[in-house]
Amino acid sequence: MKRIEGYPAPEFDGRVLRVLAHGTVHDVDPFLMLDYFESKETNVGMGSWHPHRGIETFTYIKRGNMKEEDTINGVLGVDEGGALHLSAGSGMFHTSVPTYSEKGIQGFQIWFNIPQKDKMSKPYSASFQNSDFKHIKKDGNDVKVLTGIYEGVKGPLDKSNIGLRMLDVSVDKEIVLEREVFKKGYIYIYSGNGLINDEEELISQSAYILDEGKYHIKNI
């Protein structure tokens, strides 16, 4: 298991912690980038119009609200707990800005590499609200299925060219997660600390690239 510490990035008025980037592509392909952003202010910007091509992005809003505008669907709104999926394919332009909220904003943006055969596919964008996602609540834990299938529950994102499983996991005491053979995976600790397999501490604001096998994760 390999720990990755994030570093400040210039986007989002300097309030971005870049966790995965060029140096981790080989370890977690097709994940290209993971940015964590958080601000209690309401007037921060996330950039002007810019292009994407040959990648997918998934923006997940934990707190606050966001407005996204692109050349595919025009304006899309994302409320707290919702997400935005873009598959740039042959090319698109977009911009994203937080909308006013007394809570500020907190969330993640993840970039994925589209397989070569699909890089010139038709661009696509969609927004998902919190009510579109299903939860698995067991033993005090809460697993929100963002994409893919987990324990028979399927996430709402169904037009991805990649095929990923992403979960938002809140651990009460302990949960067991598994990285399957021939798959790549990582976990990112965005709040609190934990212990994995009773051996290594999981530190907040760090990503951990997983070897294959089962992982017993405890909240400490």
Where are these predicted regions, by residue range?
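Extended, compositionally biased flexible segments
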Residues: 39-102
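Ligand-binding loop in jelly-roll beta-barrel domains
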Residues: 89-118, 201-202, 211-220
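A hydrophobic/aromatic-rich effector-binding and dimerization subdomain
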Residues: 107-137
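Short acidic-glycine-tyrosine-enriched beta hairpin
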Residues: 69-87, 179-181, 185-188, 193-220
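Generic beta-strand structural signal
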Residues: 76, 82-84, 94, 106-112, ...
